[in-house]
Swiss-Prot record:
Residues that bind ATP: G13, P14, T15, A16, S17, G18, K19, T20
Keywords annotated in UniProt: ATP-binding, Magnesium, Nucleotide-binding, Transferase, tRNA processing
Gene3D superfamilies: 1.10.20.140, P-loop containing nucleotide triphosphate hydrolases (3.40.50.300)
GO molecular function, one term: ATP binding
Annotated EC: 2.5.1.75
Name of the protein this chain belongs to: tRNA dimethylallyltransferase
Leading EC class: transferase
Cofactor: Mg(2+)
tRNA processing recorded as keyword: yes
Sites marked Interaction with substrate tRNA: T104, R126
UniProt lineage: Bacteria, Pseudomonadati, Pseudomonadota, Betaproteobacteria, Nitrosomonadales
Pfam families the record matches: IPPT
SUBUNIT field: Monomer.
Binding annotation for substrate: T15, A16, S17, G18, K19, T20
Length: 315
């Protein structure tokens, strides 16, 4: 069954791990097209602080889902999933495989697993259900469940208080039955066979040094002027907007407001980027069925190329 599904490749990694450079090399040698999986690169006019690929790179290796909205707008994980699925179908129809490249792990998870899923336990709702059960008993609660979710109720004994409570809790939190949510989740499973590649550094200190060098280069390369230009072009832009919460932009706004000096701007920008990398690596460690490649290895391209070639030929 899986072998008949079209192939897709995830190329994931923390910021400054070399994802873009590797992806560009791969698409020039293989039948792939890049879809950006980056919540910062979706914004127009935000080039320096997002380390957006330059025009020369984009001409050699076009990236989908770059520059899709302006900084005043919001782009959700749900919107990403919708756009990515459409693009993946188009790429597949052209006889190529989608190469999804980036570090926004929530987007990767949403694409792979869908938007469904059950809500976390809610102490207040559970307390309400316990009070109701104290009055009418769990068989009475089971009857309530049968009225809204007969399929789940049919699988449960009237005395199965824990599962009855959970099913009623889910309904009260979402307005949907457990049965409906499970069906929704099944329908959202990604209809592709996946190769998931994670770039991770064998030496975290080298990644930290890269991050520091890159942020300093952004400062010298016009980050301040870029943010000044954004404020001029989009007068309603403010620090609480999603676009301005991107790493580097928040700190630059603080500097422009006179709240921090040059050294603090630099230090806070580097620290925030390192924190982002730490969160990205934590997500990656929790992902299943992932091929981990050391992004500091000289032959990382060769390793990725061989893995993808083998994956694409397995049809």
């Amino acid at each position: 069954m899986l072998i008949s599904q079209p192939p897709a490749i995830f190329l994931m990694g923390p910021t400054a791990s070399g994802k873009t450079g590797l992806a560009v090399e791969l698409v020039q040698a293989m039948p792939l097209e890049i879809i950006s999986v980056d919540s910062a690169l979706v914004y127009q006019d935000m080039d320096i602080g997002t380390a957006k690929p330059g025009q020369e790179v984009l001409q050699r290796a076009p990236h989908h889902l770059i520059d899709v909205i302006d900084p005043m707008q919001v782009y959700s994980a749900a919107q990403f999933r919708e756009d990515a699925l459409r693009l993946m179908a188009d790429i597949t129809a052209r006889g190529k495989a989608p190469l999804l490249v980036g570090g926004t792990m929530l987007y990767f998870r949403t694409l792979e697993q869908g938007l469904g899923g059950l809500p976390e336990a809610d102490a207040q709702v559970r307390a309400e259900l316990d009070r109701e059960a104290a009055k009418i008993g769990w068989p009475g609660m089971h009857a309530k469940l049968a009225a809204i979710d007969p399929e789940t109720a049919a699988r449960l004994q009237p005395a199965d208080s824990q599962r009855i409570q959970r099913a009623l809790e889910v309904y009260r939190l979402t307005g949907k039955s457990m049965t409906a949510l499970h069906r929704q989740q099944a329908a959202e499973i990604l209809p592709y066979r996946l190769l998931k590649i994670a770039l991770q550094p064998s030496d975290r200190s080298v990644l930290h040094a890269r991050i520091a060098e890159r942020f300093v280069a952004m400062m010298k390369g016009g980050l301040l002027e870029e943010v000044q230009g954004l404020l001029k072009k989009y007068p309603g832009l403010h620090p609480d907007m999603t676009s301005m919460r991107c790493v580097g932009y928040r700190q630059t706004l603080e500097y422009l407001a006179g709240n921090i000096d040059d050294e603090a701007w630099k230090a806070q920008g580097i620290a925030a980027t390192r924190q982002l990398a730490k969160r990205q690596l934590t997500w990656l460690r929790g992902m299943d069925d992932t091929l981990v490649l050391d992004c500091l290895e000289q032959d990382v391209y060769g390793q990725a190329q061989r893995a993808i070639s083998g994956f694409l030929s397995a049809v």
